[in-house]
């Protein structure tokens, strides 16, 4: 058997001193050697170390990942905090904005509330004022409807129903009898005689606007005016006379004295003894005057004085520009009395107005509703007139549709005739030529005035014709309405009021106020008050004081009433 103990050296020697590669041991050999254990152990240790290193690296990576996660969490947390802080700041800003907005809204709300309160206060004030105005208007209506409710006893209880309470002072104020009648500046030494129906206050001396304006509705039909307005205008204007061409040194007194003397000299004083002139108003700048006569008839008689010489100056005597012939015709004559003694003052019917001679112009085809002022304005477009005469019906005072005129400059006569002849005026065609041309006189227009004008004149004739003879009985109109006479107590109060107020002018014998019939039948004289005095002097004083006064907002018309009708119970006059 070989000696294995020396194999090692032999082998080393065999290989030439080089160590042979280790031979693997068979498992069914002698078993592992210590070196094998050492190697195995070393390998195992290496593997363990490698594993440890891997574990360390893995743990390091895990820790790094953890740190990264922590950093990410920190960053996320920081970002979240920043976002939260940003959101908080945004919220704070929003809250600030909301607070500012809310403050502004509150301020606006307060302002709106204050404005609403002010508006509400203004509305309340307006409502109060409106209510007060409505109440005042209702009170005024009540006063006008009741007129003169006054207490019959000064000791009557003040808490009585308002509709029945009538204090003495309120009654005086409501009734209007505490107001003086319209007065004018009466000339010294001239007796003021009242006209037939009260007129309006005269203008201030020296102030005369609208001297010759065209009347409203100048090319239309006759205007319709309320009865009271027509009465005032017609009465005053029918009693006034325009006097032009006055000398520079003329004054109211000298004009009044002159025309009163002239009217007396020609027999023109038809209203009785005394001065015919009531008032004179002079425009010194333009040297003309308005002379107011006592009556319509005396004013018409004064028309014959056109061309009269006053203190060396020839004067023009005309109707005022607002003279209404239709209304004036219901109050008295509109033409001068043909029996006037004009020769007493150096005048003659042919010379008055200078409307005689070869240069006199005939103007025909005039519309009936044209006024004197309108026709004069048309003719004076060719030059000033020396004379003008619109021919009128003596009964009605309405225009007959033709006129005569003479120009101051006679050289324009033919020019005016040629220019005006054939012109259309409304539904008429003018015929203008020299009056002495041809052998026949122009045929007057036969057409009547418009039917409406006739009806208006008839109504005026019935309602406004005054009594010319002074009597002991006065008739007052425009004082009360029929509605005020239904209540017995109101009726008694009105009676007492009339006795108290109207008894101040003399011995008042009786007061009669016709009442409406209970069955609704018409009763004559309803709305009038009849006053019977003991003498004419007392009734004249009452008429002078009451005529034209305001009573319950209306202007009272006081006229003399026939005594025989009054005693017979005829109150429909």
UniProtKB/Swiss-Prot annotation:
List residues of the RRM domain: 239-322, 359-437, 478-564
SUPFAM superfamilies this protein is in? RNA-binding domain, RBD
Q: Which domain of life is it from?
A: Eukaryota
Ranges for region Disordered: 1-187
- By its UniProt entry, which PROSITE patterns does this protein fall under? RRM (PS50102)
Kindly state which keywords UniProt assigns to this record, in alphabetical order: mRNA processing, mRNA splicing, Nucleus, Repeat, RNA-binding
Q: Where in the cell is it found?
A: Nucleus
Q: What is its main location?
A: nucleus
CC per GO annotation: nucleus
| GO biological process terms on file | mRNA processing; RNA splicing
Q: Which Pfam families match?
A: RRM_1
Respond yes or no to whether keyword Phosphoprotein is given for this record: no
Expressing tissues: Expressed in stems, leaves and apical buds.
GO MF terms here are: RNA binding
Q: Main role? A: Necessary for the splicing of pre-mRNA. Binds to the U -enriched regions of plant introns.
Family as reported in the entry's similarity comment: Belongs to the splicing factor SR family.
The record's domain comment reads: N-terminal RS domain has a very strong bias in favor of D over S.
**Family matches, as NCBIfam families:** U2AF_lg
Q: What is this protein called?
A: Splicing factor U2af large subunit B
Q: Which organism is it from?
A: Nicotiana plumbaginifolia
